[in-house]
A protein has these predicted regions:
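Short glycine-aspartate micro-motif
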Residues: 4-8, 69-73, 109, 127-131, ...
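A glycine- and small-aliphatic-rich helix-loop capping segment at beta-alpha/alpha-beta transitions
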Residues: 20-26, 88-96, 124-128, 143-148
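Glycine-rich phosphate-binding loop plus the immediately following alpha-helix
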Residues: 146-197
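Short beta-strand-loop/turn "lid" adjacent to the catalytic site in phosphate-handling enzymes
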Residues: 38-41, 57-97, 109-110, 119-122
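Short, intrinsically disordered, charge-balanced linker/junction segments flanking boundaries
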Residues: 198-204
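Conserved phosphate-binding catalytic cores of ATP/NTP-utilizing and phosphoryl-transfer enzymes
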Residues: 94, 99-129, 146
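Short beta-strand scaffold segments in enzyme catalytic cores
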Residues: 14-20, 119, 130, 136-141
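Short glycine-rich, Thr/Ser-proximal phosphate-binding strand/loop in the N-terminal lobe
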Residues: 3-48, 67-68, 146-148, 152-153
Length: 204
């Protein structure tokens, strides 16, 4: 069975969906999950990327031992479109998907996960998409097909609006309340209870 593989590779986890094309329509036939990725230049970045792709693909192939991935598209956190980093990631995907003797892989595309998400949600025309997770990025497209990105600098530099950043700022507010630097508020107990903490010592 000749398969198409689509990957959503974020910093927390990676998903793989396999499909076959029948009468011009993609029919999903399997899904798998693996660990997250980090920037390729980060310590162990390439190893993590390889592991994320290979693990999620093998999980998705469990029910299709004779399946051969013919083409793969990866939307990955931290990949800039049109850069040497993109080419490097595409070579790594080829390595990760060299499964068995008959690899069959003829086409690989790796790009930023914001681009695959925008095309998946809004294939044509104007639109805008925001991703808020470990990091944050926004991608917009106008009526002429021109795209513009905002954010995507990484959580250490600028994670404004990311789920991590919002949670971090909320936790910081509760610490100021505990210190008396801010008036106490029910939000402090709500956040601490969600964390399973019943005192300032437990927060540490």
């Amino acid at each position: 069975m000749r398969l198409l593989a689509g990957f959503d590779a974020g910093q927390t986890h990676t998903r793989c969906r396999l499909s076959v094309v029948q009468n011009g329509v993609h029919q999903p036939v399997g899904e798998g999950e693996g660990p997250g990725v980090s920037h390729l230049d980060a310590p162990q970045g390439e190893r993590r990327f390889l592991e994320a792709i290979s693990t999620s693909a093998q999980e998705a192939l469990k029910n299709h031992p004779d399946g051969v991935i013919q083409a793969a598209v990866v939307g990955a956190s931290g990949i800039e479109h049109g850069t040497a980093l993109q080419q490097r990631a595409e070579r790594l995907v080829g390595q990760a998907l060299a499964i068995g003797d008959d690899t069959g892989l003829t086409k690989v595309l790796v790009t930023g996960d914001e681009r695959t998400a925008l095309r998946g949600a809004i294939p044509e025309g104007a639109g805008i998409l925001a991703i808020s997770g470990t990091g944050m990025i926004v991608l917009g497209r106008d009526e002429n097909g021109h795209e513009h990105r905002c954010g995507g600098w990484g959580w250490l530099l600028d994670g404004a609006g990311s789920a991590f950043d919002l949670g971090h700022q909320g936790l910081q507010l509760t610490l100021r309340m505990a210190d008396g630097r801010l008036p106490d508020h029910p939000l402090r107990l709500q956040i601490w209870n969600q964390m399973g903490c019943d005192s300032h010592a437990a927060v540490k």
